[in-house]
Amino acid sequence: MAINIEYVILRHLQMELKAPFTTSFGTFQRKELILVEVVDRDGVSGWGESVAFSAPWYSEETVKTNWHMLEDFLVPLALAEPIHHPEELSKRFSAIRQNNMAKAALEGAVWDLYAKRLGVPLSQALGGAKKDIEVGVSIGIQPTVADLLQVIERYVAQGYRRIKVKIKPSWDVDVIREVRRVFPDVPLMADANSAYTLVDADRLKALDEFGLLMIEQPLAADDLVDHARLQPLLQTPICLDESIRSYDDARKALDLGSCRIINIKIGRVGGLGEAKRIHDLCAERGAPVWCGGMLEAGVGRAHNIAITTLENFTLPGDTAASSHYWERDIITPEVEVHGGLIRVPDAPGIGYDVDRRQVERYTQFAKVFHRTATA
């Protein structure tokens, strides 16, 4: 089946978060994103979302650099000739170094279109079989421990299957101790976002007593070696996030013993195809995976749901309900959580309708790119 993309629309959106979200890197009150729409010659649309942030705190990519890469390099490559399978794009994009979030946004839109043309849900096109997925929730650093406990209480009452608490050197052991005292049985993990160094090994080891599911990305994003030195010192499994940008990164991390769990983020690794390859590798190695979040709007959230239906996604992910972040999302129906589960949509493609009225409301500017007559 050949997919002939007639044109691509890039939209720059800005959405206000319902509440500020704080990590060891800073506080977010709004999310800028690029929404990618690809339209074939029959007028069928596929949707993707760039998860890059406005500033390069998570990686070197930003919304502005993603727009530049999409406009000047990636969109022309996608429009150059028909596409028979979305994974062909990774070969077309191979000459472009890094810029994984930009690549993933465009590839994701093509995956959505591909699944719609097949008449199957995106989850099925990827090889997933789950009807429901377990989800957890990520909670940013709060003004006080009392505030944090109130937030956790609210999400536990809503049935979330796992609680993730952001930590940093001034907000870690004592905070987790109090959380565990109040919630002794809640599946709990800590996310450091690279806030520590190997010098802090004893401090990180102090977290062992709290029975955490994992500690996520304690050390620098580019340091697999020190993570390999740290893991044997801890009872708590290390989960790598920012360190894993590709299949090869995952392979090296597992070979070195840098982690026991991997967080797969579609944007960080360059698309659904690479995410699936990493999933398959981890399944072979006996390393569980889960799907992390990047404050996605509805389109990105739908892609996360689809990839999480693969068999080795055995730990609850960060794909919380739309209402956790937004007053109004850009999809209908919005993503809802019931009893800690999200029902996987069974409609073709991402399974949700894009709410064009809301998209228009959030759009700051847009640009259309047409296929040339020779393409």
Swiss-Prot record:
Could you tell me which NCBIfam families the record lists for this protein?
menC_lowGC_arch
Q: Which gene encodes it?
A: menC
GO process annotations (BP): menaquinone biosynthetic process
The cofactor note reads: Shows highest activity in vitro with Co(2+) and Ni(2+).
Question: Which keywords accompany this UniProt record?
Answer: Isomerase, Lyase, Magnesium, Menaquinone biosynthesis, Metal-binding
Note the HAMAP family from the entry: MenC_2 (MF_01933)
Q: What task does this protein carry out?
A: Converts 2-succinyl-6-hydroxy-2,4-cyclohexadiene-1-carboxylate (SHCHC) to 2-succinylbenzoate (OSB). Also acts as a N-succinylamino acid racemase (NSAR) that catalyzes the racemization of N-succinyl-D/L-phenylalanine. Can catalyze the racemization of a broad range of N-acylamino acids, including N-acetyl-D-methionine, N-formyl-D/L-methionine, N-formyl-D/L-norleucine, N-formyl-D/L-aminobutyric acid, N-formyl-D/L-norvaline, N-formyl-D/L-homophenylalanine, N-carbamoyl-D-methionine and N-carbamoyl-D-norleucine.
Alphabetical list of Pfam families matching this protein: MR_MLE_C (PF13378), MR_MLE_N (PF02746)
The EC number on file is 4.2.1.113, 5.1.1.-
Identify the cofactor(s): a divalent metal cation
Name which cysteines form disulfide bonds: none
Q: How does it assemble?
A: Homotetramer.
Family assignment?
A: Belongs to the mandelate racemase/muconate lactonizing enzyme family. MenC type 2 subfamily.
Entry protein name = o-succinylbenzoate synthase
Task: List the catalysed reactions.
Answer: (1R,6R)-6-hydroxy-2-succinyl-cyclohexa-2,4-diene-1-carboxylate = 2-succinylbenzoate + H2O; N-acetyl-D-methionine = N-acetyl-L-methionine
Q: Where is the active site?
A: 166 (proton donor), 265 (proton acceptor)
List ligand-binding residues for Mg(2+): 191, 216, 241
